[in-house]
Curated annotation (Swiss-Prot):
GO biological process: homoserine metabolic process; methionine biosynthetic process
NCBIfam families noted in UniProt: homoserO_Ac_trn, PRK00175.1
Family: Belongs to the AB hydrolase superfamily. MetX family.
One GO cellular component term: cytoplasm
PANTHER family in alphabetical order: HOMOSERINE O-ACETYLTRANSFERASE (PTHR32268:SF11)
Coiled coil spans: none
Keywords for the protein's UniProt record, in alphabetical order: Acyltransferase, Amino-acid biosynthesis, Cytoplasm, Methionine biosynthesis, Transferase
EC number: 2.3.1.46
Reactions mediated catalytically: L-homoserine + succinyl-CoA = O-succinyl-L-homoserine + CoA
Descriptive protein name: Homoserine O-succinyltransferase
Organism: Comamonas testosteroni (strain DSM 14576 / KF-1) (Pseudomonas testosteroni)
Residues annotated as catalytic: S149 (nucleophile), D341, H374
Amino acid sequence: MSFIATPQFMHFDEPLPLQSGGSIADYDLAFETYGQLNADKSNAIVVCHALNASHHVAGSYEGQPKSEGWWDNMIGPGKPVDTDKFFVIGINNLGSCFGSTGPMHTNPATGKPYGADFPVVTVEDWVDAQARLLDRLGIQTLAAVLGGSLGGMQALSWSLRYPERMRHAVVVASAPNLNAENIAFNEVARRAIVTDPDFNGGHFYEHGVVPARGLRIARMVGHITYLSDDVMNQKFGRSLRAPTLPAARGSLPPEGTDPTRGGPASDRRDYLYSTQDVEFQIESYLRYQGEKFSGYFDANTYLLITRALDYFDPARCHDGDLTRALAVAKARFLLVSFTTDWRFAPARSREIVKSLLENNRDVSYAEIDAPHGHDAFLLDDPRYMSVMRSYFEGIAKELKTTERAGGAA
């Protein structure tokens, strides 16, 4: 059973310098905490979120039993990241649409929503903002920083920007930068949004519209990259979707549809011979995912976050030499990859491992044979969960040893 989570907010009126050369004059950060901070404040873990996630990492909200956090299977009492042992902090990134200051919020200079005027933010900017929140909470050193996908990039960035403030970095299903293919996927998604007639140059709020068509397509493109070929074939194959009434064409699947499969089961064998209707179950599934996403995510946030992904490249300032870039890191590392993840393939994690080893850093690496593609980092694969549990149990033992040594002194 899930525990009750409570969102919190912290306001900052000290300008935050940005990598772009600009700044954010004042801003709010949304966050949640789970567990208890110990007496010497040494058991804190920051969890960094991926593209469409938030600070709501674990637990459920009061009276909303279906509101479980996006990594609730990983974090909580008795779970791999055990909140009976750790004080876990989930922080919503700047530019998001889930509570922290972002494009939907009012620009104090104009009295209108920022929209496209919200400054471009980077992974490094997010990490700097997170560090400021920890300062407010009185936490100087973290037991670990943990993240998957884009969150893993933030964990890696933490080890470079604040090497003295963390003991462990746990980087899951991530990469040291995006390759050209991933940048291309992001660009296709962004073009779908900015060419939507309702986008209005990013200032659609004041027009009372949402570029839903562009968001739907962006999500459909992105979702394809999160799944593996094996999973897509197993779930959908070439199965046809049951026909719908003409009035329902192009709409959400009808009531009773299983959205995880894309549409009601169909034993029909004939094609509709139409270029407009939903013919295959995979089409229905992608449309469902796009429709759902466009109902809760902000278009400007999508543009900002995908561009932050594109820009992340710690080796860039070191002539492309990742080993030189990682030389400042002092944390111990766990990296986890998944064999069928083609968005951030295992070879990308091995690049990080190799560079850390060349710097004589303490590194553990697990490559999990899982069929689920990039989304595997969110799922309950027993081998994956065992690796995570074992590593965090080791961190908990370190903390106990340190506490005993402090008490003896």
